[in-house]
Amino acid sequence: MNKLIGFGAVLALVAACDQRPSGDDTVEPPTQEPVGEEPVVGTRQVTVGDLNSALYNPDATNPLRVRVSLDGGVQQLQVYGVYVDGRIAGLPYESYSFQDGGDSRFFRAFAAESSDGSVNAAVVSDGGQFNRFFGGAVANQENYSAPSGGLGRYRGDYVGLVNFGDPAGEGPEGAGSGVPTESYAITGDVFILADFTEGAVNGEIFNREFEAAAAGYLPTGAEGDYELPNIVLVVGDIASNGSFTGGAEITVDGQFVNVGSYGGLFGGTNATSVAGLTRFGTGFLGVAEIASPTAPGGVILVPLGNGNEIEHGIFVLDSTGPFTTD
């Protein structure tokens, strides 16, 4: 279970008919251990947020289906429909959603497949209801052969979903937390650099911004012209099966601050594509300067927000050119 604006999800994505593989806190912590905070590598699949499995087929009648288990209860497969109002202009990710009536959780999703069909990824989240949210991401690999070595470069678009947003339905009269919420999306550019000689990968997500629907949003402590910080995907190892995981950082006053993790899979002959996922927590919204309570005239840097904001995201990228060697 996940505390609203906080801690992971229990999801399982499955796709359609042909069944192709698709791949310092300011609140009290939950009573149980948080789950799904680090990417988990499986067979041709990497998940985060306790996504158990995923199949995505953009050509199927029902490209995306999602199974959400609330507190380990009965899992029910749901078809996610195309969400036209959730599309973001120029973003090469398909938009989906599911809501079983206007008084239930509103789940928003984005998914994409590489141009060669070798990898795909999906991210799903609701914005919260009844003091909890459920969300996560998955990357999957259809096929892969490793290059003999050299540097691979991958550039393109990133999309993430946060565990807060605007009301997306109605609860009973007088209800507060019972009103469902739709996740805001965050978009950006991503650059992945992979060294297949050394078996290492790293990258950066930059030009990050909230979608237009969140134009009025400012995290707690932010003022004026607010900008999301760049997030660096620090060096991680590439396994023989093309999977990888690593940490994510922002830079604060010259210091590197961990804000989460990333993972994914390379795909295609000689790693022509890559699908990745992210999970960012406390600090990913940036920091603010406040007056020091102990040093007159001094300032301290504190994370924006209330400390429980979470972002799950994905990227699906094609190689931008032939590999180079030193």
Residue ranges and their predicted role:
Residues 2-10:
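Sec-dependent signal peptide recognition
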Residues 13-16:
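C-terminal motif of bacterial Sec signal peptides marking the signal peptidase cleavage site
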Residues 18-326:
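Mature soluble binding/inhibitory domains
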